[in-house]
Amino acid sequence: MRQITHLVVHCTATPKNTTIASIRRHWKEGLGWKSVGYHKIIEANGNIMTLATDDKTTNGVAGHNATSLHVSYIGGKDTDDRTIQQRQAIAGVLLSWLQKYPKARICGHRDFPGVNKACPQFNAEKEYGYLYLTVNDTQEG
């Protein structure tokens, strides 16, 4: 089993109407990747698509993928444009991961050393930090 230390939130930095198929095509044909960029991707309506299981390594943050799980919302081209449904879906994904990996740190792609990106266009740790309390309450009770 992989040692998970980071739960990383991303944006696709694309328009909201971008399809998952076109994102996958970009990874494969445009970037030459053999695996996907994220474990889960969230459409504007909040639909969560699983692209890889937790035991698989994806291409989310260079140098940190072996110990990270990655979730992305479609959007975030120039600003944080998450829909309410995407905000809620991200929280649900992170909560389910925290229940399995309670010591993992929630962070954004931009929070890693040497990353020169705004992704995910907001402070993920600040926004979703309350989930740590939820997990701790569940584990203690």
What residues fall within each predicted segment?
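Short, surface-exposed glycine/acidic/tryptophan-bearing loops
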Residues: 54-70
